[in-house]
Amino acid sequence: MKESVIRKLEGLLERNEEVMALLGDASVISDQDRFRALSKEYAQLEDVVAGFKAYQQAQVDLDSAKEMLEEDDAEMREMAQEEMKAAKAKLEHLEDELQILLLPKDPDDDKNAFVEIRAGAGGDEAAIFAGDLFRMYSRYAEANRWQIEIMSCNEGEHGGFKEVIMKVSGDGVYGKLKFESGGHRVQRVPETESQGRVHTSAVTVVVLHEVPEAEAISINPADLKVDTFRSSGAGGQHVNKTDSAIRITHIPTGIVVECQDQRSQHKNRAQAMSVLAARIQAVEDEKRRSAEESTRRSLVASGDRSERVRTYNFPQGRVSEHRINLTLYRLNEVMEGDLDAILLPLMQEHQADQLAALADEQG
């Protein structure tokens, strides 16, 4: 392993010990914000510190085995050869693992996310599939113990959604769900299809990270056009009878956000503003990314909403993830929320991209 990497790991080991000592300090324990921040840092350091300690131990084992080679006993020398082989293999494996753990973390990965699902080409069938995707993400969130809140929805005439925006809150939400941005295509026979023909429909998914108030871009109230209107769609006895729904237009960017899920105009406005802040931030992030990646574009994590990322073929029970040429014949499980089967390979591919970029920079 390179000396510069060893020095970095030694620095992290030292920092881990400092944080551990601070967490036992009475003044830190009494300061909840500081204690929470240090606990989070300690958790983030845990894997890399454990990996480096294992690496150091493997290095000690290798050195001991080398010393054993000097022994006169033939059996001892043979044992030393085997131990050297095992230690070298372990060092190689741990080095790869540590390289990944040292990759720069996206500071937004730990944030909550807004997931926007919109029916595209395909009419009623697209809206029904948008509803299926909403259910899939809800199941996945449930499995991860994340919380879901519907920010806005426009229901389809025959089920599903023309558009639905959900907020997903919990640990590491954006870091996983950001890979879902893009075009999702479905191929299946609609219930209304009497000839049994397979129809193709499309749904667009956009995943934005939540922008905490402290980090939010300043939005000039003069740049906003706010309209109120009566909520539409299903609601039964709870349907809004007042003009509590809100539509906010950000004039400089043309971004429009509607929220009508809450019965209070004040709550709808607050939700609309949080979605608006996330969309404006996404525009700024995209500008920055374009500048940074002008020489090299990461296909996996680009999140280009116009790009077709996945196809769900119901007659064949097949899911095809186009960005990494992954095909799984377990469509039912995926639709029930088993998304890790797709997301983990995507994350690994993204890490491989980052490692390649790092090698280019160092080379």
Curated annotation (Swiss-Prot):
Keywords recorded for this protein, A-Z: Cytoplasm, Methylation, Protein biosynthesis
UniProt cross-references to Gene3D superfamilies, sorted A to Z: 3.30.160.20, 3.30.70.1660, 6.10.140.1950
Basic and acidic residues bias locations: 284-296
Subcellular location: Cytoplasm
N5-methylglutamine PTM sites in chain numbering: 237
Main location: cytoplasm
MF-aspect GO terms: translation release factor activity, codon specific
Stored InterPro entries: PCRF (IPR005139), Pep_chain_release_fac_I (IPR000352), Pep_chain_release_fac_I_sf (IPR045853), Prokaryotic/Mito_RF (IPR050057), RF-1 (IPR004373)
GO cellular component: cytoplasm
Keyword Oxidoreductase: no
Renumbered residue ranges of the record's region Disordered: 284-305
Post-translational modification: Methylated by PrmC. Methylation increases the termination efficiency of RF1.
Domain of life: Bacteria
Family statement drawn from the similarity comment of this UniProt entry: Belongs to the prokaryotic/mitochondrial release factor family.
NCBIfam families cross-referenced by the UniProt entry: prfA, PRK00591.1
Protein's job: Peptide chain release factor 1 directs the termination of translation in response to the peptide chain termination codons UAG and UAA.
Protein name as annotated: Peptide chain release factor 1
Organism: Shewanella baltica (strain OS195)
Gene symbol of the encoding locus: prfA
